[in-house]
Amino acid sequence: MRRTVLLLATMALTLLVASGVALAVNKIGTNGPDTLRGTNGADNLVGKGGNDSLIALRGKDNLLGGEGKDILWGGTLRDSSVGDKTLVGGPGNDSVLGGKSSDSLSAGAGNDFMVDGEYRTAVKDNLSGGSGNDVINVINVKPAGKDVVSCGSGFDRVLADRKDVLAPDCEKVRVVHGTLDEQDEQEQSWFATIPESFFEGLHRI
């Protein structure tokens, strides 16, 4: 009987995968360094302790880094990152990178690096830096989405579009304008002022 049930369950799973139905996962890391990757479903990825890398794919995903110097990525170069994401870094110097959809990004305590979307899309994201000296980049190509940024305590630096809504607690703000080439030049100039330590470990993805 148990073999029959197992066989039927295996057949059902095979049919779901073959039909393209997205299956969600829940993955929880350890107190050491972990790499957790999502699926095309709605996933929950929890890093816990250690310097973790959490990578979302399609689906409405929730990523929680926990303690440590974590990297949270709302989508990779190999997928379209469909589905709104919620990314929470937690304590530690985290890198929180949004995807193509309207994401909610929260870095937590620590000196964090945040980007609203690697793909420069025109959706609206909500970003919260938390405590610490954060670096936040929310520029997009036109038509830009109206991103909402709260920096929190600490000395924070923000690169933004004219449409973005920035809280008064963002200490150093630079607003870019002009053509895409001009925006790229301004962005490169701005990044040159950021300490290299903010970008250490990004090769883990």
Positions of predicted regions on the chain:
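Positively charged n-region of N-terminal signal peptides that target proteins for export
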Residues: 1-4, 9
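Bacterial N-terminal signal peptides
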Residues: 8-17
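Sec/Tat signal peptide C-region and signal peptidase I cleavage site
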Residues: 19-26
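Glycine-centered beta-turn/loop sites at beta-strand termini
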Residues: 29-32, 38, 47-49, 56-58, ...
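Thiamine diphosphate
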Residues: 113, 135, 190
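Leucine-rich solenoid repeat scaffolds
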Residues: 138-139, 143-181
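Composition-driven, intrinsically disordered low-complexity tracts enriched in small residues
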Residues: 183-205
